[in-house]
Amino acid sequence: QSVSADLTTFVEGRKLDDDASIMIRLNNGAKGSLSISQVATGEENNFTVAIYGDKGALKWSQENPNYATFSQVGEPSQIITRGGSIKVEGTEANVRIPAGHPEGYLEAFAQIYSDAADVIQNKENKEELLKLLPNIDDGLHIMKFINASVNSSNNHSTWTDLSTIK
């Protein structure tokens, strides 16, 4: 729905922002935040996704791709591992290598390419695969998000509604 962004270039001479803090308001009332940096001291190429809710949290990091942490209020946190006892329906077909070997960033793109090839070849589950693949509307929405973030940052981080972005 809307964003408030602070984009900064810390490295002199760099043409693009190398650090961003973005607050997000979603249509359903949920809120989120993004912290993105190419200049975070001590980090290598850390990509972490954390989702926090009123009943629990889920956290995954690219630097440890075989593990996710699941926490429920009032319960000890659980480490979920690839190939462990917790199975997620529909994911087995997307696993390319045995448990214990890291799987993540490159395999995610490989899965998109594989699903797109299946759609092009008219496989039986084409409609289901199309729901998982990024499409032009997804791309337009991401471009609106980026433009709204730049506009917000250029206007002292004022909240910017994505619907105002053309």
Protein language model features and the residues they cover:
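A residue-level signal for beta-strand positions that form part of recognition/binding surfaces
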Residues: 48, 57, 159
